[in-house]
């Protein structure tokens, strides 16, 4: 695709608006959807709206962060610090994000009970299955195993660099959860735990004991399968979790 400053310079079949009308919004990439919001690119760097949108997502994902998580909590000041994003583009992006939040909040609330590895895998499938990069996520639960929040903590290449107990339990405490399930994916599809997976689980079980917040399981998701470390290992016998 030619990243010139004007959408008009892109072939009609590749323009985001035209593609949305032709094939539907759900088939557009994240960059294409943002490009529709901001309308124009950055002429100083010869970027089309799509090119600038890709740059915004790349900037938000620095440090192995989830770009959507960053956008959900971003401010006008943070957005305008990105080259090519002025107040108008920042306002357009933030308006789109806020509208999405309000639509989501208007949905009838459905309580999701996560009381088995299978239920946890279903809750995590959209975030972790069929991903090209390794992702680490946490399910925040209440005392009755009702799902409070699903958070992708980090995105990276190796389990040992993906997650730190501090980051994981910060999410749990922030959401007022009383128990958690952690999970990450193996892009290869092999759901057998690596030595690093076992070491990380051991550290997190120890942290959970200290904090009094039980870690219920650690799942590894593949392409269309998953494995439960609680079922496969004796770690939970070695580090009994608080009730």
Swiss-Prot record:
Disulfide bonds: none annotated. PROSITE patterns: MPN (PS50249), UPF0758 (PS01302). Gene3D superfamilies: Cytidine Deaminase, domain 2 (3.40.140.10). The keyword 4Fe-4S does not apply. Pfam families: RadC, UPF0758_N. The keyword Repeat does not apply. Zn(2+) binds at residues 184, 186, 197. InterPro entries: MPN, RadC_JAB, UPF0758, UPF0758_CS, UPF0758_N. Residues 112-235 form the MPN domain. GO terms for molecular function: metal ion binding; metallopeptidase activity. One of its GO terms (biological process) is proteolysis. A motif (JAMM motif) lies at residues 184-197. Keywords: Hydrolase, Metal-binding, Metalloprotease, Protease, Zinc. Belongs to the UPF0758 family. This is UPF0758 protein SYNPCC7002_A0220. It comes from Picosynechococcus sp. (strain ATCC 27264 / PCC 7002 / PR-6). The lineage of its organism: Bacteria, Bacillati, Cyanobacteriota, Cyanophyceae, Oscillatoriophycideae.
